[in-house]
Amino acid sequence: KRMLSNRESARRSRMRKQK
């Protein structure tokens, strides 16, 4: 089970775009 917060999801999205 992963409890990712909305803010954490957005942060990962930005890192993915940078990569």
UniProtKB/Swiss-Prot annotation:
Keywords attached to this entry: DNA-binding, Nucleus, Transcription, Transcription regulation
One cellular component (GO) term of this entry: nucleus
Name of protein: Probable bZIP transcription factor
Coiled-coil regions, chain positions: none
Localisation: Nucleus
Protein family per UniProt: Belongs to the bZIP family.
Entry annotated with the keyword Iron-sulfur: no
Alphabetical list of InterPro entries matching this protein: bZIP (IPR004827), bZIP_sf (IPR046347)
Domain bZIP: 1-19
Region described as Basic motif: spans on this chain: 1-19
GO molecular function: DNA binding; DNA-binding transcription factor activity
